[in-house]
Amino acid sequence: MDQNPLYEVVGDVSDVPTGLHLVAGLTGFTDSGSAVGQITELLRGLPVVRDLVVFDNDALLDYRARRPVMFFDEDHLSSYEPARLVLSLVEDELHRPFLLLTGYEPDFRWEAFTRAVMELIERFGVADTTWINAIPMPTPHTRPIGVTVSGNRPELVEAFSIWRPRTQVPGNALHLLEYRLQEAGHPTAGFVLLVPHYLADTEYPLAAVAALESISAATGLIFPTDELREEGRDFTQKVEEQVAGNTELERLVRTLEERHDSYMEENPLPSPLVDQDGELPSADTIAAELERFLASRRDEPRP
């Protein structure tokens, strides 16, 4: 395998089977509900994880924007934890291998990074590529998390994409990868989760569940979600307790529900996210009332 200056191959990769799915999720862009962060932690915590390729931080990372962690031990620096952008070989719950691209979104050289990933896709004979992102939307937490699907797999768009706007969006590195893969005719799908925007700054377990379900729909891979679902039930119960104690909150959530349901029933409204005048509903009151709950949850130690 010819060496590319943007990455280093870790050991012998000649035994990596061809025809695997590639799953990608990068942090640094919008990650509402910490969906990408949570699934990265879960997938890299699976029993079988083997790093194949490590990308060069000095070429791709802005250290001053995302400073690495240094560990200070009384009177000296004891260790250094740099960011990592890595392609790994992982196994799902049924011990089926797949490729996983995780880490930071490159700050620099997006075209070169895209070419490098496409080179790896060709080298490993990847069958298809699926990537995940999550953005905030004024949708209610009482309804299933919706997704917008992009790419060149129309069966996934038709089955799962509930919002299909014509608009300009701020691009990310995986958008560019998808665009180039489409040009090359490689099967690719991007799933953008529509997370309730008043929960966007939390670690929302059901966002991670929705992300894993999307990956499963695109690839057939199976992942452990029982713990996340249980955390999601506890999280939702706490949110419901906050909402139930405030009439204004109840009214605002009900309004979001009505807009969502009208859209899902093919109401002529152009989107569940706007009213008939095209204005986004305000969630300031929701955010203010939930602030205490969200802050307290962030401070809770994780088991």
What are these regions (language model features)?
Residues 96, 104-155, 176-177:
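Internal, conserved structured core segments that host functional sites
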Residues 199-303:
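A conserved C-terminal secondary-structure "cap"
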Residues 138-218, 222:
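Catalytic cores of processing enzymes, dominated by hydrolases/peptidases
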Residues 26-30, 101-110, 160-168, 198-202:
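Flexible, glycine/proline-enriched loop segments at strand-loop-helix junctions
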Residues 18, 31-34, 38, 108, ...:
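Conserved active-site and cofactor/substrate-binding residues in soluble primary-metabolism enzymes
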